[in-house]
Amino acid sequence: MVELINHGVYLLNGTEIRDNYQGMTPDEARENTITYGILRSHDVDGGKGNKMRIRFDAMMSHDITYVGIIQTARASGLEEFPLPYAMTNCHNSLCAVGGTINEDDHVFGLSAAKKYGGIYVPANQAVIHQYAREMMVKCGNMILGSDSHTRYGSLGNMGVGEGGGELVKQLLKNTWDINAPEVVLVWLEGAPKKGVGPHDVAISLVKATFESGVVKNKVLEFAGPGVKNLPIDFRNGIDIMTTETTCLSSIWVTDEEVKHHYDIHERPQDYRELKPGDVAYYDMMIRIDLSTQESMIALPFHPSNAVTIHELQADPVGILTRIEEDAKKRFGDKVDVHLVDKVVDGKVQADQGIIAGCSGGTYDNLAEAASILKGKNIGNDYFTASAYPQSTPVSMAVTREGITADLIEAGVVMKPAFCGPCFGAGDVPSNNGLSIRHTTRNFPNREGSKPGQGQLSLVALMDARSIAATAANGGVITAATDVEYENTHKPYVYDDKIYKCRVYNGFGKAKPETELRYGPNIKDWPKMYPMQENMLVELAAVIHDPVTTTDELIPSGETSSYRSNPLKLSEFALSRRVPEYVGLSKEIQKQDLARREGNVSENVAEALKAVGATAENTSFGSCVFANRPGDGSAREQAASCQKVLGGDANICYEYATKRYRSNCINWGIVPFTIAKDVEFNYEPGDKVFIPGIREAILAGKEEIDAQVITKEGVKPIHLFFQNLTANERQILADGCLMNYYASSKR
């Protein structure tokens, strides 16, 4: 289904693929990709070098990120939004926990849209990325979003997901600085068989690329004869999931299908044809034969942990036993897992089916699911099913077409445009429950279970079609390719009347006299200190998992209700992975604050004595070690919570994503790495002393000798901090992005 070609290729006239071409060098021909055409047009330097400084055309945020972004920008000198900035309310939109705090955030958002000239999308009107697809994208444009699934390449608009700090830079008319990326040709051939949906293709792509990191920080450019065989919703469903490959962004060729999207959304002027130049070079290629694609299931605890549904059916006990063993390794005695119990008479029984969000809740997905369930029902046993249309226009369309009625008649509960099932704030399964979902992720506990309280539920990702086939079979996991159905629903008809009624669009019409409306949970950022000459950090968490997700660094779900309150939110940092982290970090921070007052603790004094350093010019902070941290969400809180608790550094072998590393930098956390052949067999309580770190960072150095202080003595360690821009170095020296702007008035 998916073939990786790990060498460069030339694409001639958009049709012919060659390994070699004599008329143009790779660097010259790479400029002819769609990717470079868009990136270069957004580079404020206008050059063709290896560095790019990008200004975006528009931005997107949702209600668990925009408050922090605006608070940071305010503290850094914000006066007016200089570009269209849409704020959707699709995460804490149920306002089900924390009393008034969620709606307080929404009220703050509307007041900010009025004051600074923003776009405000009220609760449950649309999930963030569907609103962007409907109202914000333009061919050849770039959108920056404070959500990792900011991907609109299938509509000719490059999307990038980053932490809030990068959006703050754009609000202050600064740039997104990157090295010129490599570009990967994703060549689509054939057409998918009946019953195969976008999630099947996307899961296969993630399976083929994630573990090796082969497309990490590269741009995926989709082309080939198979593109024309995919409707827009199908393309969008693949595109949104490219985030899970750890690629930087994505872009597709555009055609009549894309033109039709802009036409029905009453924006024909925003369409233009995008295609590679006559000779374009790609650094590698992925070939996908759509005709051989099977129905897939991504098992816990990652979208890449995938098999075909037929493979699961052939060996259910063996495959689920391996998942159980993985769960026991991750959670130890905290939870009691019985996944193999889901095998009944040789078949796997799910407890819940969900179709939701930016990937699942499309018109086409819901229409085809309804066709599969037509005349059937989900039964009255333990299996339940819910569907969430991804916007009010989609909800209106499925209602008018009778799709809603068909789903409700089959026993599916219809719910509003809401991202809850994707981040643990809605439809949390029962303990030991197995939920099959057409959503973006199935990370540990992302569905809302709390292992610290003995809870664990499990999520497997499947396409909406196979979820519907499973629902029609009473929850027995079933491939949609194995059922007979006819999809007779009419094409999607878009109606934006509800947006015209409800969405506030104040871009270009800022009202600076407007007072921001604060609830009691909305707090300013605490004071953060500049970097001192030397750095002493104590390990507060040491994680040897292959990958550490941002969901583990700071949980989502109901915890996200506190994202407007930095101190309160930080109490949940690593709570589901390293429960003792917060207490250790607070004690370290307490000792550093005492040191700044001239009261050096015995703990700090002994460590400094061991390395011959003094307390006056040596900061003391906490540090997290993880093998590969930062996979998943763009949430800046994965880093800011560490900083609020006194975190000064991360140490790892590599960062899972650029966006997490950028979050660390913007919050003044030095992103150290160590060589892959170096063992890190230290434990919480051990310390790392980095002499002369401030001077080294400001001088442009990329590595430094440090010392690890353990009970057994002092050991050397060599740390790297590579590929930092001049601005990033100054941000680290100043202590965080806010300090950087405050000190320089940039």
List each model region and its residues.
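Fe-S-dependent hydro-lyases/dehydratases of central metabolism
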Residues: M1-R746
